[in-house]
Every structure is written in C-alpha cells, then in structure tokens.
C-alpha cells in the first residue's frame, strides 16, 4: 500500500534527515503547470539544506513517499484532494490523489518521517459553524509525532479559532523568531504563539522534548521574508465571491487563490511561491537537527 522511494528508504534507515512535502499544493495551489515547479523548488531547497525530500501522493494504486520529477508532473488539477480518510480508497480505486497536509502527515508518520514543510495548514473556516468546516489537518497533526513548518494557517481561514482548536488538541504552536502566529502573507498580527524559538536547533529540541513526553505534532510558524500586509480585504472579497458563486467544500481554496492572484496583479502568487520555498529550507535545517545520524556526527 505504501511505496517508499529507494533514496528515502536508505536515508531513513541510516538515520538521516528526510522532510515530507504535500502534493495538494502542486495540483491545486497554483495555476496549471506552475505547481510542479513550486514542488521541485521545495525539493531543491531541502537538498541545499542537507535533507532529502519525500514528496507524498497517491499513484497507480499506491501511496508514494518520494516521487520522481516525472511522477510529480502527473499531479494536475484533475487529481483528487486526499486527506487522511481518503488515502486507502484512493489507492484501492487506482485514482491519482494529491495529499493535503493531513494526508501527507498520515503517510509520512507511517514510515517514520518527523518533519513536513508546506505553505499553510488547514483549519477552522470562517463563519463556523455555517459552514461546519474544519480541516482534517488539525486532528492528524495532533496525533502524528511530526513538526510542520508553515507560514501559519491558510489566509482564508479563521486564524484565532484555529489557534484555539490547536491549543485544545495539545499542539504546540512555535513562532520562528516571532511572538505571534504569522498570517500567511502577513508576518505578524496573529494570535500569540505558545513559545518563540530562535533557531532550527531550538525548534528541534522543543519537538524532541514534546515527543519524549508522549505528545503528537507541532506547528512551527515562519513569517514570510517579504510580507504582504494588504491582502485581508482581497481575501474577504474572494470569500464573498465564492459564496455568491455557490462554491463550497474543497473547491473554495483554489477559487480564493485564483481570485487573489487576479486581483493582486500576481503579487499573492509570487509571495506564496517564495514562502513555500523558505519554509522548505527551514524544515530541512530542523530535520538535520532531529536526524540521529546527524547528531552522531556533530
């Protein structure tokens, strides 16, 4: 059911640094044809940091942990969005499935990968309980002993409510050199984090201590290097347009992203690409601090 790429298996077996990457971002996070390059750039950033990428997706009846460039190119807008509940059915039915953060965590956790990089995690949708929409990313993060590096929560969500739910689930929210949770495009203004860390090494130490105490996942919020502070009005406009058009469920995020790209003159897409790469680089640095083999050499 789970097929681990040879390189990923060898590095994991040797106690090396491996970082998981999702494929929903590749298939649905950017205009057709651009997501693959974003995924490849994340992989390049991980290798530059000294870690090995393990991009996760469902292909040909298997959950793949580690993809070739050709395999990554098969994840287009037609791919199913696959959360934790969908992995088995998608594989059995032979569909192409792009894994969400939650789906990626489920697969990565099953093979012992402890770090994941993404743009932003899912969470509580605005207007809850109408619609009653909460991402499965949160529950999977709570039960998987892994650290997720992101620019916070996706911009279209209710960030304070998501932070409250993470606290209820026992998920530490760390700020990378910041005291508040980054707001995806914006560097500051979110809820206070549970702890601030100043380095990849400190983040790794907190994560390892959390796991030694029986904890599950952690979120490490990294603010974007070049934040956009004027996006919130566009997000509200995009959500209103989605509601008026009858867009709901999993279709909301790509609809909103396309609206933001169009109305911002491409600034949001450029910022999104940059922060995804930045998060991958930091995730690679954290993975090096966690990897047993790297510790033995230091």
Where in the sequence are the language-model features?
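A C-terminal functional module that forms or caps the active site or interfaces directly
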Residues: 210, 214-278
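Solvent-exposed alpha-helices and their adjacent loops that cap or buttress functional pockets
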Residues: 9-13, 18-19, 107-110, 115-117, ...
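Glycine-rich nucleotide/cofactor/substrate-binding loop typically near the N-terminus or early
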Residues: 23, 28-30, 36-90, 212-226, ...
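General beta-strand structural signal in soluble alpha/beta enzymes
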Residues: 19-21, 54-58, 97, 115-120, ...
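Glycine-rich, Lys/Arg-enriched anion-binding loops that position phosphate/diphosphate groups
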Residues: 158-189, 205
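Anionic-ligand binding region
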Residues: 185-211
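Divalent-metal (Mg2+/Mn2+/Ca2+)-assisted nucleotide/phosphate chemistry catalytic cores
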Residues: 68-145
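Active-site glycine-rich loop that binds ribose-phosphate moieties when present
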Residues: 100, 129-142, 146-167, 198-205
């Amino acid at each position: 059911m789970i097929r681990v790429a040879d390189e990923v298996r060898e590095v994991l077996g040797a106690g090396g640094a491996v970082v998981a990457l999702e494929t929903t971002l590749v298939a649905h996070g950017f205009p057709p044809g651009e997501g693959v390059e974003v995924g490849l750039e994340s992989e390049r950033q991980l290798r530059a940091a000294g870690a090995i990428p393990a991009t996760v997706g469902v292909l040909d009846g298997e959950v793949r942990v580690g993809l070739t460039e050709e395999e990554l190119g098969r994840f287009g807008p037609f791919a199913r969005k696959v959360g934790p509940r969908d992995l088995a059915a998608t594989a059995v039915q032979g569909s192409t499935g792009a894994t969400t953060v939650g789906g990626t965590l489920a697969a990565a956790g099953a093979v012992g990968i402890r770090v994941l990089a993404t743009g932003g995690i899912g969470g509580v949708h605005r207007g809850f309980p109408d619609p009653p929409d909460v991402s499965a990313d949160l529950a999977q993060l709570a039960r998987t002993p892994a650290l997720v590096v992101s620019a916070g929560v996706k911009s279209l969500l209710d960030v304070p409510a998501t932070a409250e739910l993470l606290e209820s689930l026992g998920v530490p929210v760390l700020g990378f050199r910041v005291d508040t949770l980054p707001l995806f495009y914006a560097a500051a203004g979110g809820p206070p984090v549970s702890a601030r860390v100043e380095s990849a090494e400190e983040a790794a130490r907190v994560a390892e201590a959390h796991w030694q105490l029986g904890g599950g996942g952690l979120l490490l919020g990294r603010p974007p290097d070049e934040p956009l502070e004027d996006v919130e009005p566009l997000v509200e406009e995009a959500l209103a347009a989605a509601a008026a058009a009858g867009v709901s469920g999993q279709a909301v995020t790509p609809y909103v992203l396309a609206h933001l790209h169009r109305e911002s003159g491409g600034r949001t897409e450029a910022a999104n690409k940059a922060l995804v790469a930045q998060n991958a680089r930091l995730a690679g640095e954290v993975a090096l601090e966690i990897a047993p083999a790297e510790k033995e050499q230091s």
